[in-house]
Amino acid sequence: MEKIIVRGGNRLSGTVKVEGAKNAVLPVIAATLLATKGTSTIHDVPALSDVYTISEVLRYLGADVHIADETVTVDATGPLTVEAPFEYVRKMRASVLVMGPLLARNGRARVALPGGCAIGSRPIDQHLKGFEAMGASVKVGNGFIDAEVNGRLRGAKIYLDFPSVGATENIMMAAVLAEGTTVIENCAKEPEIVDLANFLNAMGAKVRGAGTGTIRIEGVDELVGTTHTVIPDRIEAGTFMVAAAITGGNVLVQGAVPEHLGSLIAKLEEMGVTVIEEESGLRVIGPEKLKAVDIKTMPYPGFPTDMQSQMMALLLKAEGTSMITETVFENRFMHVEEFRRMNADIKIEGRSVIINGPCQLQGAEVAATDLRAAAALILAGLAADGYTRVTELRHLDRGYVRFHEKLAALGADIERVHEETEQFDQIQTIQWNG
């Protein structure tokens, strides 16, 4: 087992480049299954374990997938199987995104119930509601979701009870080959939705309204492979913005898109952080003293739940009382106990957390509880006295590429070691060939 060891106290400075967006590339890779002609080529693909997992799912289904030099090439023109087994899907809940493409193309999909981060109840009922509205018969049992339709899916009007990103993506992918027109109301508006729509349209789909509350999809008879470059990762960008702020540093986050980060920029500026838009990204300059603020997570364009734990780390250093309210996911405060191990004055009240700052953070041995919590604990370590040791790095590797190396290049005192010996060891990278 590996751990990251960080000694706090260093101000970060320099430039860090943002990778392609994990939450955009996964549905785009799933969507390549829709192409019955040609090969799809995707650029700026981050070298993450989740990308490897969904690529393995596609290979199991019958697609030919090659990954090298931040590029994924998929040929799914041959026959596909309809079942994605538990051994793959358990690793990552985004694997359920193959369901829409399989149902649209083959008329049947059998997918194991998903895994991924253990963040409370993350039901997929909205996905299934959409499939049923388009004429599919859906059954859930024995750890699997079975969906089947006679002939083609039919266009339908679908209202989502909550603007779920995954449901919006899955229904979009199912609808592009459906007979007739599908309208998705109260859909997700995230930049990753727009990116998926752009990819689908480049394949020959007719998707309109992505980025608004209503998406209209006119079904087509076939889709063709295309070339696509994934948008930059706004959550990785936000994480490095917080890293600059928590250390009082001066960092240019190269590739950060201001339009994708409006709510985060607003909260950082409210805390006294300087954010400057430059030609290649965003420069973030941390103040000597941070101000307390209140945050409520909301669907985009509201404050992203995926930045909640990182901002919690930052608010531990702010003067005054702050409150964070989580409205998107249940049980996303598991990292609070780990912050307490670092001397954080923090308590949970229902779906909110109360922080009394500034806290004199102290280095401690802590365990990551999910992907974003892993990054947040490292951020807290950057501002703590002494050494912080973060374990359960499998969570971190699902969403960040060479995270400790990027921080070290900015001046952080950080290394990744084997737990048994604590000898410095370079991160084990996935072999992206084959």
Curated annotation (Swiss-Prot):
GO terms for cellular component: cytoplasm. Belongs to the EPSP synthase family. MurA subfamily. The active site is at residue 117. UDP-N-acetyl-alpha-D-glucosamine binds at residues 93, 122-126, 306, 328. HAMAP family: MurA. It is found in: Cytoplasm. Transmembrane segments: none annotated. Keywords: Cell cycle, Cell division, Cell shape, Cell wall biogenesis/degradation, Cytoplasm, Peptidoglycan synthesis, Pyruvate, Transferase. This is UDP-N-acetylglucosamine 1-carboxyvinyltransferase 1. It catalyses: phosphoenolpyruvate + UDP-N-acetyl-alpha-D-glucosamine = UDP-N-acetyl-3-O-(1-carboxyvinyl)-alpha-D-glucosamine + phosphate. It comes from the Bacteria. PANTHER family: UDP-N-ACETYLGLUCOSAMINE 1-CARBOXYVINYLTRANSFERASE. It holds the Pfam family EPSP_synthase. The modification 2-(S-cysteinyl)pyruvic acid O-phosphothioketal is found at residue 117. GO terms for molecular function: UDP-N-acetylglucosamine 1-carboxyvinyltransferase activity. Phosphoenolpyruvate binds at residues 22-23.
